[in-house]
Amino acid sequence: MEMRALAQSSTVDFWHLRWEDAVAKGLRIIELASRVEDPISQASARRWVAITLINMGEPNRANPHAAATLVIAKRTRDQYVLATALWFNELLFSYQGDWEAAKVFSEQGLLLSPSDNRMVSSRMLLEYQVGNVAEAREYMERFVEGIQLLPPPPNYDQAAMALKIPLVVQITGDMDLLQIAENAADMVLSASSATPLVSQLARWGLALIAILRGDVKSAREQYSSLILGHTRFVVVSGDRVLGLLSQTMGDSDQAATHFEGALAFCRKAGYRPELAWTCHDYAETLLQRQSPADQAKIMELLEEGISISTDLGMAPLLKNVISLKEREESSLVRGTGYPNGLTEREVEVLRLVAAGRTDREIAEELIIAVRTVTTHVSNILNKTDSANRTEAASYATRQGLA
């Protein structure tokens, strides 16, 4: 009875973000299991200890529990329990960038349960990370179709959609997909049954949507909400999301603080794919700040990002990091020569502003994120002492830049 009660309590702790308690209770169940044969409680304890330690950035401690979960799950002959064990093992290796090991568990899980949205969405992200676009799209379609078939109320699967679709958009640039994620997030947050963890995942999704759209107002709203219950990692680094929100809000110093937190967490945990993305986003933020004091840090981040993404075969990210590095090297060699300290990229944006283009239209033409355009426009207004886009356009005409 004690094992069953602890198992139920540890599950509640996990979904309510009381992770230290979830681990402590799970370990107590494992201790009791040496005296009582109760595979269901053992499997529950092991899996919550495993996934909690994974999210806390302790994969070495999580690994034996994830492996034991799989052994015990096979003994239970419960399809859901086994699929969950396979999924946790897949996550453990994906977060560390061991794609081949992750795929082994993914294939087993999808063979066992082809419509399991957890397995499908994880595989979708994996394939997008390594640039297997055709395969990734197939998993995306399966994921979206699977979510549409779910009955109310919304649960983890809808929250995962709210979070994972924007992560896909960060890789592909397909902004039209964001509406799907936004609808899922709104559905989750309107449900009284949503647990704190599920609600937080939905808010992370809304945060990424605000970042990708360059929506400063929404970015401020999401930052204020997320900073109160700050969680370090679930699929993505919480500090990386907060750093990107800060960048969107125009606070580069605050962004740098969060990015440093994300770097420290990912390095300690060995979560190399997320570390590479953090290097990219941090470097881009410093590039936009345009301080000569940041140049050494920028190159250090870009070199690390290139090294990791090359080693892990993360082709889409590698392309983006190389592009940032070329921009930085070009600006160092050439300098700008433009008035008011405008950079070459800012002049490109200014010309399009003067032509009446919206931020999204500029982003599409220059093949950069909308949030990046928004930051450039803010820098342009400050440097040219312009109150709005119309005054900036007039400045461009006077200076012969348009």
Residue ranges and their predicted role:
Residues M1-V235:
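Extended non-membrane alpha-helical scaffolds
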Residues S10, A50, E90, M124, ...:
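Conserved small-residue packing positions in alpha-helical repeats and bundles
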Residues T257, E300, E326, L332-S378, ...:
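Helix-turn-helix DNA-binding segment
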Residues Q295-A315, E326:
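TPR/TPR-like (Sel1-like) alpha-helical repeat modules
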Residues M314-R334:
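Short, flexible helix-to-coil linker/hinge segments that flank and couple to helix-turn-helix
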